[in-house]
């Protein structure tokens, strides 16, 4: 036996979508119902564990044998569930995930959607969702079902038979996907990165249970107080209803089209009296400050560690990681100077003092979300992140030497950019210091062919800049960065040429090719970005553009239009991702326990190592990136925060 393809059907009273697989498999009533498998791509067999069948010893040993490949679509689910079933942790070595391989080739992270895109003969069965609802989750007790809370096989033998067919079909579909993808193997280095990712997810991160419970309780108190006050002021049955509140505001003489955050903020600028207070209460009531605390409570296991928070290859156009469950990639920044004081007041339930000291207690709860992640006793977090990594990689790729020199000399890149743009010295809090903000917004908004719209999205108008000033910032920045501008147009030209001629071209340290309907961009690391079904289309201006297929808003598979600057953004972010994975590989090999990573930052739980040592490891450029200057900065803390 060389390869085992697997799919499980399971039961647990925990909600998989809310709790994640680690907590799901911890449930006292967790059970594997069906075990479908194929040995070396042979016939698929289904073991009906729920009806008393057993898994053969040969298969059990194969699951533990790291030299035998175990394949599944979303293999993390199978590995974690089987670890619980066997009573021992199955290490990720030897486990391979067809979902990850699909993502590597620009395909969806869903078995059903991949099957549709690849037009497989054997698609995932549509009956599956209804069968899972029937057999895999608790049912509502009714007189008709004899007040039972769970459906077992004998309650509907016909459905159970279909469930077994569904289980078998999932393995057949997974194997068919594997066969289709075999022409484009994923590099071994990426499977090694996947193993590290699985180890990090298995390790998890500790949640401060007391802080979480206190924050949720305080939010309930705040919401009740704010609702009572809003009812008192408006006389409305439900002042949190946009329809009712808009009508009340209109009667008071305030014409407001929407109660969206920006509209309320705008209206507050000129509001007075009751209207001002009611709008302020509306802001407080609409804040979702405790949703992430609720998510933490749902996800944390018996040991209070939250696991499965990071999705490997979650962003399949770049290969970057994405957040799951608590969505750690999207945490509110903290800017409180007395963060520890606020944290301790909430944790100790000292709500009255908190309300006296802070104008917006709900805002404080939002800022404390990060601090609910804590280091275990006897350790502390070392938090280290790359400094301006995208700006560094972009300049390195384009050969924009003055930017590289600025980074090498330790200069403030926003000051140096402004100086280059306007031809005058710029110093932070010094001579021409007011220009630094323009250098900053230009650096952040213009690097990927961003123009007026990008600067507006970055908040340029809110900063008091006119459209004319914003356009001049774009023009000055492009003039100051000719090599980056050339990079956009060069990439655009090469990609179009390759798609038209179905050829292969080397550009700088990239290789761009078209193979079997897929546009590939090989990065300096040798990893490839994939753009399925790429072809020449027409943009809204009547010019040529590249169109490929991928996941769009609403999780739909559709056509996506792209251009030079957008491809450059994908390439730069993908290279930055590869730098992060190499750094994490080095850290893990040296025995450092990464418990979380967010964007370009790693969080390590350590009892002895120093921040200097971690930063030094992070700052090592990969051998495939000669001349790239990296820098990492960090700090230590007993809880997670932004420094």
Residue ranges and their predicted role:
Residues 5-6, 73, 95-97, 373-389:
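Conserved catalytic palm subdomain of right-hand nucleotidyl-transferase polymerases, strongest
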Residues 12, 76-88, 105, 246-251, ...:
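Short active-site loop/helix that positions an aromatic residue
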Residues 1-16, 34-36, 130-365, 380, ...:
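Conserved "right-hand" nucleotidyltransferase catalytic core of DNA-directed polymerases
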């Amino acid at each position: 036996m060389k390869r085992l393809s697997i799919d499980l059907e399971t039961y647990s009273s925990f909600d998989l979508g809310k709790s994640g697989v680690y907590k799901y498999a911890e449930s006292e009533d967790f059970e594997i119902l069906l075990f479908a498998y194929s040995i070396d791509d042979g016939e698929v067999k289904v073991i009906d564990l729920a009806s008393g069948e057993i898994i053969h010893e040969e298969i059990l040993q194969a699951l533990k044998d790291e030299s035998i490949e175990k394949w599944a679509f979303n293999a993390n689910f199978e590995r974690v569930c089987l670890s619980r079933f066997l009573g021992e942790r199955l290490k990720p070595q030897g486990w391979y995930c067809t979902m990850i391989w699909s993502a590597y080739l620009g395909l969806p992270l869903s078995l059903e959607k991949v099957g549709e895109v690849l037009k497989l003969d054997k698609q995932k069965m549509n009956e599956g969702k209804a069968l899972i609802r029937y057999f895999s989750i608790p049912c509502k007790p009714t007189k008709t079902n004899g007040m039972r809370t769970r459906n077992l096989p004998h309650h509907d033998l016909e459905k159970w038979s279909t469930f077994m067919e569904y289980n078998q079909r999932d393995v057949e579909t997974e194997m068919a996907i594997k066969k289709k993808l075999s022409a484009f193997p994923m590099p071994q280095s990426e499977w090694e990165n996947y193993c590290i990712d699985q180890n990090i997810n298995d390790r998890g991160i500790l949640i401060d249970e007391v802080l979480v419970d206190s924050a949720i309780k305080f939010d309930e108190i705040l919401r009740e107080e704010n609702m009572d006050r809003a009812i008192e002021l408006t006389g409305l049955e439900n002042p949190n209803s946009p329809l009712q509140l808009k009508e009340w505001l209109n009667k008071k003489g305030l014409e407001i089209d929407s109660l969206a955050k920006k509209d309320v903020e705008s209206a507050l600028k000129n509001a007075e009296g009751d209207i001002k207070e009611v709008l302020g209460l509306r802001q407080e009531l609409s804040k979702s400050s405790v949703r992430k605390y609720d998510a933490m409570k749902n996800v944390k296991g018996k040991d209070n560690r939250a696991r499965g928070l990071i999705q490997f290859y979650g962003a399949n156009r770049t290969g970057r990681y994405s957040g799951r469950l608590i969505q750690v990639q999207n945490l509110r920044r903290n800017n409180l100077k007395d963060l520890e004081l606020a944290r301790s007041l909430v944790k100790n339930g000292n709500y009255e003092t908190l309300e006296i000291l802070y104008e917006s207690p709900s805002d404080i709860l939002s800022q404390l979300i990060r601090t609910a992640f804590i280091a275990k006793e006897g350790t502390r977090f070392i938090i280290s992140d790359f400094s301006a990594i995208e700006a560094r990689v972009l300049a390195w790729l384009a050969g924009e030497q003055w930017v590289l020199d600025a980074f090498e000399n330790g200069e403030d890149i926003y000051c140096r950019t402004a100086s280059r743009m306007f031809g005058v010295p710029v110093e932070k809090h010094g001579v021409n210091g007011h220009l630094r903000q323009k250098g900053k917004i230009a650096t952040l908004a213009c690097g990927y062919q961003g123009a007026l719209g990008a600067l507006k999205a970055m908040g340029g108008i809110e900063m008091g800049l006119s459209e004319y000033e914003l356009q001049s910032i774009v023009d000055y920045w492009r003039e100051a960065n000719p090599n980056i501008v050339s990079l956009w147009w060069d990439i655009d030209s090469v990609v179009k040429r390759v798609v038209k001629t179905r050829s292969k071209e080397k550009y700088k340290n990239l290789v761009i090719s078209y193979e079997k309907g897929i546009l590939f961009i090989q990065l300096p690391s040798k990893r490839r970005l994939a753009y399925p079904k790429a072809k020449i289309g027409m943009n809204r201006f009547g010019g040529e553009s590249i169109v490929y297929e991928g996941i769009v808003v609403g999780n739909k598979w559709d056509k996506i239009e792209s251009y030079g600057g957008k491809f450059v953004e994908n390439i730069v972010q993908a290279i930055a991702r590869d730098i992060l994975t190499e750094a994490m590989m080095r850290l893990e090999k040296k025995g450092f326990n990464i418990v979380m990573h967010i964007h370009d930052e790693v969080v390590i739980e350590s009892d002895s190592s120093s921040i200097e040592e971690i930063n030094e490891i992070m700052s090592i450029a990969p051998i495939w990136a000669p001349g790239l200057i990296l820098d990492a900065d960090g700090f230590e803390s007993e809880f997670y925060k932004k420094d």
